[in-house]
Design a protein with these regions (language model features):
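N-proximal low-complexity "stem/linker" segments adjacent to membrane-targeting elements
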Residues: 1-32
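C-terminal catalytic/acceptor-binding lobe
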Residues: 9, 181-226
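A short acidic, amphipathic alpha-helical/loop segment
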Residues: 29-33, 55, 126-128
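Short beta-strand-to-loop acidic/aromatic patch adjacent to the donor-nucleotide binding site
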Residues: 108-119
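Conserved catalytic core of nucleotide-sugar-dependent glycosyltransferases
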Residues: 102-103, 122-197
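Active-site-proximal specificity loops/subdomain of glycosyltransferases
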Residues: 2-11, 51-110
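Short, acidic, metal-binding catalytic loop of nucleotide-sugar glycosyltransferases
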Residues: 30-44, 48, 58-59
Length: 226
């Protein structure tokens, strides 16, 4: 690789960057959906109470390119006001967790963030692995949000590209905690990856179907709340 340039025909072979907490309902289906095109990665988990940890350990035994990582701390979720009051230890923050997972992946390799409440289209993922031309390029993925209504029928509720699902080169990467208030005064807090390039280089079309409320089945009743 000279001056960060990639061969025009180079296909990236990324490591999966995965974090899990109580996502049994979609976990195995999500992991199986990436297997045709992603063969290695780190699957981190913490505070699992629904058996997700057992699924992960078994999946990694069956697919030895994937490594399990039990994060030994509780993590405050996105949106918590505790990020503003700064009463959290670093290891209990999202950025602390993400940085710990990142340390388990080799440097100077490509990584793709995988969320296990999504079912992926492997052919679209594979196409995206040919897109980057330099190690500074960033691929940003979009997804189709779906929800179950009170009749247990699936409904499409949005097509989004939120910027939190990416393919990047693991050089000088790290995460920070971000918090503040929007124009309406609503509080927000989340983790943010720090990249050299501010805008995505490539934006392939829908790479996955996202089931954002499968963790909490009670929240599936009520499309009007979206």
């Amino acid at each position: 690789m000279r001056s960060g340039l990639l061969s025009n025909k180079a296909k990236i072979d990324p490591w999966a960057f995965i974090r899990v907490k109580d996502e049994r309902s979609t976990l195995l289906a999500s992991l199986n959906s990436i297997l045709p095109v992603i063969h290695k990665g780190v699957i981190a988990y913490n505070d699992c109470t629904d058996g997700s940890d057992e699924i992960i350990e078994r999946f990694c035994r069956d697919n030895p390119g994937f490594k399990p990582f039990k994060y030994p701390y509780s993590v405050e979720p996105a949106g918590s006001i505790k990020y503003e009051t700064r009463e959290l230890k670093e290891e209990n923050t999202l950025a602390g967790y993400y940085n710990a997972v990142l340390q388990k992946i080799p440097k100077n390799v490509w990584i793709i963030k995988i969320d296990v409440d999504q079912i992926y289209f492997p052919k679209i993922l594979e196409h995206s692995f040919y897109l980057p031309r330099t190690i500074n390029d960033v691929v940003s993925y979009s997804r189709l949000n779906m929800i179950r209504d009170s009749n247990n029928d699936l409904k499409v509720v949005g097509y989004v590209r939120p910027g939190d699902h990416w393919l990047v080169f693991n050089k000088d990467l790290y995460f920070v905690n971000v918090c503040g208030r929007d124009e309406k005064g609503n509080f927000y807090s989340y983790e943010q990856i720090k990249l050299k390039r501010k805008e995505p280089s490539f934006k392939p079309e829908c790479s996955s179907i996202h089931f954002p409320f499968e963790k909490n089945i009670e929240s599936l009743w009520g499309l009007q709340n979206l």
